[in-house]
Amino acid sequence: MGAQLELIPHQEVVAPTVKPVSLQDRIDLAVDGIQGLIRSGRRLLIATSFGKDSSVMLALVIMAIRSLAERGHRVPTVHVMHADTGLHENPVVQAYAHRQIDAVRDFADAQNLPLKVWVASPGISNQYLVNMIGGRTVATVGGMDRKCQQSLKAAPLGKLRRAIAAELRQGMGLSYSPQKVVTLIATRRDESVARGAAMAARGESSMEPVNLEADSGGDYWVYSPLAEWGTMDVFSFIADVTNGRRRTYSDFAELTEVYRDAGGDCMVNLHLRGEGERRAACGQR
């Protein structure tokens, strides 16, 4: 008798359920990551333009250090950096940023938080518009914004980082190391395909800091706590603060107004039309 075939009952393959990541999950992960850096002895520099992404990042940093302090952890000074681009900046945006700087300082004083705000400005001889008028550079058009960005933002912030490093070196003595200094930046992968690709190429993530100057033997460590955040996560966080569900250095009402005034619409509608993510290197962020 030939071998009999055993019939195997059909089993339906059920795909595993993937739980969506909630806003609170993203907040908890970001706060845990920031606290982990502090507990490991890293000194934090926070780069902020007071645009939507960097404002949310700064609020997360404040949440992290407040929580640590409440649990009895010693939190070293966190250095907040802002680039005032001077003549080029929209006066409304510039005035808004100055008020945000005052708000951060007032909140830190009231809450006894170890925050120190530094403001970088391009020297008058390096002002982009002064150089253009004086014939030392030419106006950038289209995508030719690297010289503008370098003059007004990157170079002054680089000088500021060196000044902060010198202060840390003096205060920490022999325990100081360039590897201990980490700059938090508010880059997100979903800002654009190009931004996501650039972040991947540099190794930026919300998991651990990356040294952007490793190839040249330098030490410029950056950490991106918002790397995996979507634009709607950012908007939802801002809405929570504006509606009083979360408290930080600002109620973000003026931040919302700046975006609304810029486009005549609410931030969410700007995003849906694709206008909320358009940024020039020397423009509003």
Predicted regions and their residues:
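Nucleotide-activated chemistry modules centered on ATP-dependent adenylation/adenylyltransferase
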Residues: 1-46, 52-285
